[in-house]
């Protein structure tokens, strides 16, 4: 019966506590239960990997069995998926620290008066961030009622936390503006004594090249765009690749390339437990997620 076939699949899956795709059986039309190495369809492995991760994620979440994990979690724009918090707020930083994540990602723009401020989008409440002075921007409210923070305020709060800081410097209107922003940010991070606790990321290759020039030696520098080969990023002086989940799926050799180059890997923005498990299984170094609480539930006792 179909029930017996499904039971055979589940029994085989649970027998292998750590997921091993080559050992998973599945039902294929009237052909009964097959193992993946018997399939003549090249898409079967990817399909079964997806299904098995879904089942395994539910099992871990339901029974509280932690996964074996070396992947570190970064809270995307802080831990804002909780009461009293908001994206890129100081509360989201403090709540992420209380949650026990490895790192907190946040977004930085340079206001028109040269003051770095935190915001994701280029506009907030009708004001273009890089064309507006910080004296105006800091009167604007976030969703939790906090004013838009300056980078100085954020770093001051971060001094009393243990989290690693993942600073995304947003692309600006001109290369000159990007250089000025990179110089201001690196200088400010150094002034607060946090240089060893900061990773810099950006979608702008110009910004990343400037950060490679400006940041202290051994600073983690990771590019967010997916259109440049890892080896070319390393040649620019970058130390890691911070790619969207889809980029890794579309370029299946890149993770191994990154490891061979002795670069760090990060995947974003992964909120689905099955996709989180993909990152863990593939030994991605860092995962950026809006649900760090869910990731920790998967991986902690």
Predicted regions and their residues:
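Substrate-binding cleft of secreted/luminal carbohydrate-active enzymes
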Residues: 2-47, 275, 283-287
